[in-house]
A protein has these predicted regions:
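Bacterial N-terminal signal peptides that target proteins for export
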Residues: 1-12
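Sec/Tat signal peptide C-region and signal peptidase I cleavage site
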Residues: 20-24
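Cleaved targeting-peptide boundary
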Residues: 25-31
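Central antiparallel beta-sheet cores of small beta-barrel/beta-sandwich binding domains
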Residues: 31, 39-117
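Structural recognition of beta-strand segments within beta-rich domains
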Residues: 35-36, 137
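Structural motif
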Residues: 48, 123-124
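Residue-level recognition of beta-strand termini and adjacent short loop/turns
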Residues: 98, 124-126
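Edge beta-strand at a domain terminus
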Residues: 127, 134-152
Length: 152
């Protein structure tokens, strides 16, 4: 029978438990309310099935010059230009890929009416890098969002 010294077993046991947090990933760590880098809006990220989505829950300027709630006036689809910006689902179909990354999603920019491929990375508990791009990720722009409310 093989005899393994007690000290080796103890060290192996401690290493296994010390490494456990490195492998345990919180797929839902992204859930909550996030403020855009410009500070002009907040998006609530939520989960539907196994994918992640986001909707506008706050706008710095919620109303147009006439005092009416702002709408999606820059949307290329004319029939959607009257929908309110507040409540608009502007993030969709993100998949958790490990290493604090959610990818293969889409982001809609109501300022331009454009829809982009998008990846997101949680760099710390309260900082989210949101990268919108056309085609490949190197042809894009990254915005840094800050957590406002964590999902309870």
């Amino acid at each position: 029978m093989l005899h393994i010294p007690k000290s080796v077993v103890t060290v192996a046991f401690l290493l296994a438990f010390a490494a456990a947090p490195l492998f345990a990933q919180n797929t839902d760590a992204i859930l909550g309310v996030w403020k855009s880098g410009e500070g002009t809006g907040m998006v609530q990220i939520y989960k539907k099935g196994d994918k992640y989505f986001g909707k506008v829950v706050w706008l710095k300027v919620p109303n147009d010059p006439d005092g009416k709630p702002r709408t999606d006036i820059n949307n290329p689809e004319e029939s959607l230009r009257t929908r309110p910006l507040k409540g608009l689902e502007n993030l969709r179909d993100f998949v958790f890929k490990g290493e604090n990354k959610w990818e293969e999603g889409r982001i809609y920019d109501p300022k331009t009416g454009n829809d982009y491929a998008c990846d997101m990375k949680l760099t710390d508990e309260n900082t989210l890098e949101v990268r919108g791009f056309i085609g490949v990720s190197i042809f894009g722009r990254t915005d840094v969002w800050k957590r406002q409310v964590k999902k309870g």
